[in-house]
A protein has these predicted regions:
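Active-site neighborhood of HAD-like aspartate-dependent phosphohydrolases
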Residues: 1-49
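Conserved active-site and cofactor/substrate-binding residues in soluble primary-metabolism enzymes
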Residues: 16, 68, 155
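Metal-dependent phosphoesterase signature
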Residues: 56-92
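C-terminal cap/substrate-recognition subdomain and adjoining C-terminal extension
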Residues: 1-2, 75, 82-218
Length: 218
């Protein structure tokens, strides 16, 4: 049983689900449109440059979850899935998941996007488990705070190692990891088979230097 790990945004999806959720909230009038959109765009640029202050970003991104009922959030999420996510699920990404499934591998998505956004996407893609940023909940509502270590950059390695403590049959020693982003270099360096998927320029350069496989799912 080998572990096949996948980044989500711009790897299995041709969009960034976190940024798309921010756009969706603006369209719904759920947040202050111009200010939120400007901040959302800036944080995406910071992420792409490998310079994101994750805690500053999360204080903005998780706040709307604390301001609305779970019922409202779930209704929005269904609309969001239909209009913002389904059109961006890459058919070749689904084929790659199917190939690993056929091999009998354990399919794991690890993402720096929070579980509220990504839980239903992971279910839709049919993976075995999901490691995501965990928004804290109290009494059935989100608090706007984050729980535990954010699964971002080195935090992805930390969270996977914590997760592996409960998975005696699985190891990184024969694992695959697919990602598009230089932010994921730390986990790519830990696995047996790192694969750069439609990589950003910095990851493409690193992949060439390390002789890592480069793949396009588009």
């Amino acid at each position: 049983l080998s572990l096949a790990i996948f980044d989500l945004d711009n790897t299995l999806l041709s969009c960034d689900s976190d940024h798309a959720w921010g756009e969706f909230l603006v369209e719904q009038g759920a947040v202050d449109g111009d200010a939120y959109r400007r901040a959302n765009d800036q944080y995406l640029r910071d992420y792409q440059a490998g310079q994101l202050d994750i805690m500053a970003y999360l204080s903005m991104a998780l706040k709307p979850l604390s301001e609305h009922s779970e019922e409202q959030l779930n209704a929005w999420h269904q609309q969001f899935m239909a209009c913002k996510i389904e059109p961006h699920i890459l058919p070749q990404g689904e084929e790659l998941l199917a190939w690993h499934r056929q091999r009998g591998d354990f399919l794991l998505i690890v993402t720096a996007t929070n579980r509220f956004i990504t839980g239903p996407i992971a279910q839709r893609l049919g993976v075995d488990d999901l490691i995501a940023i965990e928004p804290e909940r109290e009494n059935g509502r989100y608090t706007g705070r984050v729980e535990g270590v954010p699964s971002y950059r080195e935090g992805k390695v930390t969270r996977i190692r914590q997760w592996l403590e409960d998975q005696p049959a699985l190891t990184l020693d024969d694992a695959w990891f697919y990602s598009d982003s230089i932010n994921d270099r730390y986990l790519l360096e830990e696995v047996a088979t790192p694969v750069a998927v439609d990589p950003d320029d910095a990851l493409r350069a690193l992949a060439n230097e390390r002789n890592w496989r480069v793949l396009s799912l588009r």
